[in-house]
């Protein structure tokens, strides 16, 4: 899907933490995604990581606001929250076995890869190079990575 992007934990955290080195760049890209009506995907596993990091890295008020705003966004058609159900979890275990030579790729990242393949998503907002190391043609955003 050409007008779609998957947002990884790094993307959500960087967007919501003004102290992050690439916050302004990610915030600008995010505004463009919204304006262009890009379909934004993420998973329940990614949001689990994201919400945990919000409360570790931001003050409690900021973390609460970020969590509520992000949760609210996923009630709109432009945002798609993909559940990691039993089938996807099983498929991810197979991916883990396929990429034994890449132990640094987290299980959560593998669930994201599975979703990106399932929904034909080529772009991902992340700073994590693992997504390009598996040879599936994923493109990291912002594109200056």
Which sequence ranges carry the predicted segments?
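Short beta-strand segments at enzyme active-site cores
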Residues: 41-43, 126-127
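Conserved glycosyltransferase catalytic-site signature
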Residues: 9, 44, 106-110
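Short, well-structured N-terminal submotif of metal-dependent ribonuclease cores
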Residues: 1-42, 55-69
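A generic structural signal for short hydrophobic patches within well-formed alpha-helices
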Residues: 12, 47, 131-132
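Conserved beta-strand segments of alpha/beta enzyme cores
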Residues: 39, 78-80, 137-139
